[in-house]
Structure formats: C-alpha cells, structure tokens
From Swiss-Prot:
<dbReference type="GO" id="GO:0006412">
    <property type="term" value="P:translation"/>
</dbReference>
<dbReference type="InterPro" id="IPR020568">
    <property type="entry name" value="Ribosomal_Su5_D2-typ_SF"/>
</dbReference>
<feature type="compositionally biased region" description="Basic residues">
    <location>
        <begin position="114"/>
        <end position="132"/>
    </location>
</feature>
<dbReference type="InterPro" id="IPR014721">
    <property type="entry name" value="Ribsml_uS5_D2-typ_fold_subgr"/>
</dbReference>
<protein>
    <recommendedName>
        <fullName>Small ribosomal subunit protein uS9</fullName>
    </recommendedName>
</protein>
<dbReference type="Pfam" id="PF00380">
    <property type="entry name" value="Ribosomal_S9"/>
</dbReference>
<comment type="similarity">
    <text>Belongs to the universal ribosomal protein uS9 family.</text>
</comment>
<dbReference type="InterPro" id="IPR023035">
    <property type="entry name" value="Ribosomal_uS9_bac/plastid"/>
</dbReference>
<dbReference type="InterPro" id="IPR000754">
    <property type="entry name" value="Ribosomal_uS9"/>
</dbReference>
<dbReference type="GO" id="GO:0022627">
    <property type="term" value="C:cytosolic small ribosomal subunit"/>
</dbReference>
<dbReference type="GO" id="GO:0003735">
    <property type="term" value="F:structural constituent of ribosome"/>
</dbReference>
<keyword id="KW-0687">Ribonucleoprotein</keyword>
<dbReference type="GO" id="GO:0003723">
    <property type="term" value="F:RNA binding"/>
</dbReference>
<dbReference type="InterPro" id="IPR020574">
    <property type="entry name" value="Ribosomal_uS9_CS"/>
</dbReference>
<keyword id="KW-0689">Ribosomal protein</keyword>
<feature type="region of interest" description="Disordered">
    <location>
        <begin position="103"/>
        <end position="132"/>
    </location>
</feature>
Length: 132
C-alpha cells in the first residue's frame, strides 16, 4: 500500500486551531506535540473524534501519526487533528475519499466565535431594556 520511508501531510483546521498531521506506515502510534494521544487528550470523547477518520476507513493500526497542533482549545484541537488526518488519509489512497466525504470528515467546519458588536454586551446579547 505505502512504501516504508514515505509520509503524507495533511493540514486540518477547526475554530482557531491548526493541526499539521504527518502519516507514515506503521503500527498505529499517534504522537501529538511529543506526547502520546492518551496523555495529550485524556477524555475519551476527544480521542474518538481524533480516531474517527481511521475508524471510518478501517486503517486503525496501519499508520503512525506525528501531529503538531497550535491554537484553540481541546475541542477545536481535536477537530483540527481529525480534519488533518482525514486529508492525509485521502492522499494515501484515493479510494478512501468516498468514505471520508460521506461521513463529512473532509469538510472544514467553519463555525467560529462570532465577534462582539458595539452597543451589545456580547455578540448578540443586548443590555436590559428599560421603558422609563
């Protein structure tokens, strides 16, 4: 499927987080910012989001991943990593594209925090209305 020394790069984004994913053939070791996935993301929900592209394409123990992630919080980072893994998996084999696309893993989730408007307390919350 993939030669030993080749690797595939995918860049994923979610909210303000950006993840650069390097996939290479291996036995399923995932390292995020120099730490194993279990140490970096302790909650099972985030790990499931990250591993979802590999579960969908049935490539769970076939690739090692070295991931660098910048910005955002835990949810944004896990979403960015999943997006990056999906993009890198697509480069490994074009046949995986259909499975990834049908599960919405190649689509960039563009929902970001809405900016605060002048005259309002938050993006949409207005100060309390007083009649008199």
């Amino acid at each position: 499927m993939v030669e030993k020394n080749t690797y595939f790069i995918g860049v994923g984004r979610r909210k303000t987080a950006v993840a650069t994913v390097k996939l290479m053939s291996g036995n399923g070791v995932i390292v995020i910012d120099g730490k194993p996935i279990e140490e970096r993301f302790t909650r099972i929900q985030e790990r499931n989001v990250i591993l979802n592209p590999m579960m969908v394409t049935d490539t769970m123990g076939k690739f090692n991943a070295v991931i660098k992630v910048l910005g955002g919080g835990v949810t944004g980072q896990s979403g960015a990593i999943a997006h990056g893994i999906a993009r890198a998996l697509e480069k490994t084999d074009e046949k995986l594209r259909a499975a990834l696309k049908s599960n919405g893993l190649l689509t960039r989730d563009d929902r970001t925090k809405e900016r605060k408007k002048p005259g309002l307390k938050r993006a949409r919350k207005a100060p309390q209305y007083t009649k008199r």
